[in-house]
Amino acid sequence: MINLTEHLHLITLRRGARRTQASLEGREELGGKAQGLFSVGQVLTDIMACEFPDIRIDIPEMTVLGTSVFDAFMERNQLAEIAYSNLPDARIANAFQRADLPFEVLGELRSLIDGWVTPLAIRSSGLLEDVTQRPFAGVYLTKMIPNNQGDPDTRFQKFIESVKFVWASK
């Protein structure tokens, strides 16, 4: 049995900075990979419940920062010009690291990190990565973090740095 809503959460600015269960109403906030996982999870949930009720599939917990969070990050820090420039990657990454994430989501992100002490994969689910005619798969980096530091402040800082690192990659 699969209960997808226990495993897929969406953080967005449009519906307030809170952990919400992903639903069809929030799918415009999801990039391609997240939408794909959500869709596959829904199909599996329906099939498994009807045809294979005794089989259990474990889906890792996943939290998605909606596109509105990324858009606010870019706009509030005026990063569009530098992000789309021909500057060296190191300069772009440095600008992203100096920028602030939207304050509305920091508390929610902090509570996630406080509750997790397992390794994390921070990945992009950008809309451009999934254009059918010109896929950008693999353009954005994945950042793996051990998330095993004893100090929650250090774990949170490493997590935020990783989010910015992935967003800066291109």
Predicted regions and their residues:
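N-terminal beta-alpha lobe that positions the nucleotide/phosphoryl donor
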Residues: 1-170
